[in-house]
Amino acid sequence: PVLLKASAGGGGRGIRRCDRPEDLSAAFAEAKAEAQACFGNDEMYLEKLVLRPRHIEFQVLADRYGNVIHLGDRDCSVQRRNQKLIEEAPARCLTPELRERMGAAAVKAAKAVGYENAGTVEFLLDPDREHFYFMEMNTRIQVEHGVTELVTGVDLVRQQLRIASGLALRLRQEDVTLQGHAIECRINAEDPVQGFRPCPGRVDFLHFPGGPGVRVDSCLYSGCELSPYYDSMAAKILAYAPTRMETIRRMRRCLEEFTLEGFPTNAELSYQILYHPEFILGECTTAFLDEHLSELLEFSRKLSESGVDA
């Protein structure tokens, strides 16, 4: 199988999987039209489709003087429609040796193109955890940058501004250490039961979680209107703790405390994912939601019918 992808793509748009040669022409036409409509650019490229991979990415910083470092990895395998839903750092599935190899590859890629900025080098890691494949580089600060900030203590936005101002990196690779574990849940205005249909609207009531090891990035407030003309993401809830299991428990508590009235969100689905054995063991691949969505939604439905509120 192969994957058709929009050169200017993002957010899971302009992507088509193709398993049979006879389907390639139609899939190409569909993806090309979607790319033109979404990005104003219909250029496409073709790549090998890695089945059941993990989505592992490395944060890099590069200045104009040739200094390039990475700030560790993130596991972004829990996705819907090729768009990330839950991200964490560091990736539980990586051995120290594999982390070193992938980090070195990310730095080498950035150096090869003379990159200057904060950026993310994204890889697909195959199921046997022996081979990894370059997927793309995001030449910007990403949604999930916060989990890297929490485990490294490095302010990525500040570093990006310093680089843009022409200043040399003060950090060296040996200065970067990963401490603890961080998880981010994206809160999207969408209905998972209706195929993740966007559900913009007015925020009638809003309460975000708080406390030690909790970070919320959002511009929402009670009474505001979430526009239908932009991405459905409404907030990011991040949790940090010394161990991964402590972080999972803290994020569960965050989602129990989070309240938004006015339109549906994916918060309940993310809460169920945090209890799933595959997630707890750190075994999720990009196929996780495709394989388990129905059971996760069914459990949520039974809770709702029984009057139990997560």
Feature names for model-found ranges:
Residues A6, G11, C18-A310:
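ATP-dependent carboxylate activation and anion-phosphoryl transfer catalytic cores
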Residues P1-L3:
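Acidic/histidine-enriched active-site and ligand-binding environments that engage anionic O-linkages
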